[in-house]
Amino acid sequence: MLEIELAIPEFTAPKTANDLARKLNNRQSLLLIAYDQAKPVAYKLGYQLNENTFYSWLGAVLPEFRGQGIAKQLLLAQESWVKAQGFMAIEVKSMNRFKTMLQMLIAHDYHIISCKPAQQSTEVKIRFRKQLG
């Protein structure tokens, strides 16, 4: 997963193993990785936010593998697992600069629940929530 994280040109501050350990410490979590042959090409990582909500924290697809539906497959697999674990909702944050992600979330019934302003409009943080079941 960190190998993919480091190869994403849009990520100006890639996460480290320490970042992951701090965030996931003692939380129920899920890491999904998509492979092309034996090469990891995409991932989706999330964790339990509270008793009823799962937070989809990180995800990325290597540039040369985008447009193939991999992110959608990971999103749907994550939703299925989260629902099976008994969570009632999934939350995720994105930014205006990730237009494809915003479109995918809206297309899959994620609703905007808040926005955090930024000096540049591309950096506005948008929080989405999807009710499950």
What name fits each language-model region?
Residues 52, 88, 111:
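Short acidic/polar active-site loop segments enriched in Thr and Asp
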Residues 91-95, 106-127:
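Conserved catalytic-core motifs of GNAT/GCN5-like acyltransferases
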Residues 1-57, 62, 118:
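Acetyl-CoA-dependent GNAT
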Residues 61, 67-80, 107:
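Conserved acetyl-CoA-binding loop-helix of GNAT-fold acetyltransferases
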Residues 74, 98-101:
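Conserved short alpha-helix immediately C-terminal to the canonical SAM/SAH-binding motif I
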Residues 82-94:
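Conserved GNAT acetyl-CoA-binding A-motif
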